[in-house]
Each structure stands twice: as structure tokens, then as C-alpha cells.
A protein has these predicted regions:
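A beta-strand edge to alpha-helix "cap/lid" segment located at domain peripheries
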Residues: 2-26, 37-146
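Helix-to-beta-strand junctions that scaffold the AdoMet/dcAdoMet cofactor pocket
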Residues: 32
Length: 146
């Protein structure tokens, strides 16, 4: 581990910077180096363990794609000893145009080497999708808890 992130916020900023720059090594420096880590990208299977996460970001960064710009807002933070839980709203722009809004949970653990990411889980924001899809339901959908 080359970077010693002094706060979970610093590690989170490095995560989004690495996403924007498609920088695999910077991305991997954010993650905790063990097999308890997990990452869930929207519409994708869960990646478990550092090797799977590396392979997932490697594939994402290798594909020719326009640069994404992230605006993080609506942040909620909770620190419980050596674990920090952040929930955020990710607005993703390509070429200055808003293309997606995600709700994400980022979990960090404090280590002797600084704060490291333990979990990233992102899902589309429901209200944003409904606006974009422009449809109405004939009958209200049942409320389900998972």
C-alpha cells in the first residue's frame, strides 16, 4: 500500500479521482488488501475479493470510454470506531451532460496504513430513472422489503 489515507473522506476522494482518471493503480491503492472486500456496480454481479475487484476495474478502465465526471452530494457519514460508513449520491456526467445518478454506499476500515475501502455498492437512483423512463403504472406497485 503506497498511500496512507488519514481519513475515510480522503480515501473516498481518491476512489472517485481514480474512477475519473481510469487509473487502476490509484484505484487499487484505496482498497483494503484482503478477501473480505466487495464491490457491486449497477446492474452487475458482486465482485468479491481483491483479485476480482482488480479484474473488474481493469476491464472497466481498458474499454474505450469517455471520461466520466462525478459530483458527490447528499453525503451521510457515520464512524463507528475503525469502520466508517458513507452513503452518497453520485451524479455522473460525460461531456458536461448528466447521464446517470446513483446512490452508493462506501464502507472504510482504519488500518495501520490508513483508511481503506472495504465495500462500494452503487444502484441507480429510483426517482432519476422514473423521470428518464417517462412512464406511469396502471396499478401501484406493491411495497416490498428485502
Amino acid at each position: 500500500m503506497t498511500n496512507n489515507y488519514q481519513t475515510p473522506e480522503e480515501a473516498e476522494l481518491a476512489f472517485y479521482d481514480a474512477m475519473e482518471c481510469h487509473d487502476l493503480e490509484a484505484m487499487m491503492s484505496v482498497w483494503l488488501e484482503n478477501d473480505t472486500v466487495a464491490c457491486v456496480h449497477p446492474g452487475a454481479s458482486r465482485l468479491e475479493g481483491l483479485a476480482d475487484i482488480r479484474a473488474g476495474f481493469e476491464q472497466m478502465f481498458e474499454e474505450p470510454a469517455p471520461t466520466m465526471d462525478f459530483t458527490i452530494s447528499d453525503t451521510r457519514r457515520q464512524c463507528l470506531g475503525n469502520v466508517a460508513i458513507h452513503t452518497v449520491r453520485e451524479e455522473i456526467e460525460i461531456g458536461g451532460q448528466l447521464v446517470s445518478v446513483m446512490l452508493a454506499t462506501n464502507v472504510f476500515q482504519k488500518t495501520p496504513f490508513g483508511w481503506r475501502m472495504l465495500l462500494h455498492h452503487a444502484s441507480p437512483e429510483f426517482d432519476f430513472e422514473l423521470d428518464e423512463m417517462d412512464f406511469t403504472l396502471d396499478h401501484p406497485a406493491p411495497v416490498m422489503l428485502h
